C-alpha cells in the first residue's frame, strides 16, 4: 500500500549557526553544515503529523503539528477515533542539544493544530520564549480538548478567527502553555469576530471563496 503523496515531503528548514533542521510531514532531520557547505546528516526523528514547520531557539526545536493522525507518543499507527486522549495537534518542543538524539520535552495542544508558527521574542530576562501559532485545520471536538468551539461565528468563544500566543519557559519546556488566543480578524468597533471576508462571490462568473477565519502563514 502506497503512502499518501505528502507523507515524506519536506516542508520547512531552520538554521542556527552551522546547524540545519529540515521538517517534514513525518518528522525532521538534523544536519551539521560542513566547511564546504554540504550538510552532514546527524539524526532523524520519526514523528508523523505534519505540518512540520520548524524553528530553532538555542537548544530547543519548535515544530508545528496539524494533522489528526498526530500522536502524543509520535507513534506510526495514527488515530482513527473522532475523540482520543492520544491525539496531538499543536506545538511540539524538542531538546536538540544532542543533534543525533533529539528528545521531546514539551507539547502544547491547540484547538486547530499548528499549520505554522513564528517565534516573536525570547528568551528574555524572564527565560521565556513567545510564539505565535496559527492553525488552519478543523476545530477539534470539545470532548477532546476543553474550550474548543467551532461555531462560525455564532459563539464569541469560537476557536475560529484566532491565533494562539504560546509561552515556553526555556528551563522547563514541559510547562509551555497558551497564554492568550486573540481574535485577529475582529472589528475593534463592533466586536464582530468575522470582520473580513465572509465568503461567497463577487457576482456572475466570479470565483467563490470561503470565509476568512484563519491565518495561513
What is each of the regions a protein language model found here?
Residues 1-217:
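Feature marking well-ordered beta-strand scaffolds used for ligand recognition
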Amino acid at each position: 500500500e502506497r503512502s499518501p503523496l505528502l507523507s515524506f515531503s519536506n516542508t520547512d528548514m531552520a538554521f542556527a549557526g552551522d546547524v540545519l533542521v529540515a521538517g517534514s510531514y513525518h518528522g525532521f532531520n538534523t544536519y551539521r553544515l560542513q566547511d564546504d557547505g554540504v550538510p552532514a546528516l546527524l539524526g532523524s526523528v520519526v514523528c508523523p503529523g505534519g505540518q512540520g514547520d520548524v524553528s530553532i531557539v538555542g537548544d530547543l526545536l519548535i515544530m508545528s503539528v496539524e494533522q489528526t493522525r498526530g500522536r502524543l507518543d509520535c507513534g506510526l499507527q495514527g488515530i482513527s477515533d473522532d475523540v482520543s486522549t492520544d491525539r496531538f495537534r499543536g506545538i511540539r518542543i524538542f531538546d536538540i542539544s544532542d543533534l543525533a538524539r533529539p528528545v521531546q520535552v514539551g507539547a502544547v495542544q491547540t484547538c486547530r493544530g499548528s499549520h505554522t508558527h513564528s517565534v516573536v521574542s525570547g528568551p528574555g530576562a524572564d527565560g521565556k520564549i513567545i510564539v505565535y501559532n496559527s492553525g488552519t485545520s478543523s476545530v477539534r471536538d470539545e470532548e477532546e480538548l476543553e474550550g474548543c468551539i467551532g461555531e462560525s461565528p455564532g459563539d464569541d468563544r469560537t476557536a475560529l478567527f484566532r491565533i494562539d500566543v504560546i509561552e515556553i519557559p526555556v528551563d522547563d519546556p514541559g510547562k509551555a502553555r497558551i497564554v492568550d488566543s486573540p481574535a485577529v480578524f475582529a472589528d475593534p468597533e463592533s466586536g464582530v469576530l468575522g470582520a473580513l471576508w465572509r465568503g461567497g462571490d463577487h457576482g456572475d462568473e466570479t470565483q467563490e471563496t470561503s470565509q476568512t477565519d484563519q491565518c495561513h502563514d
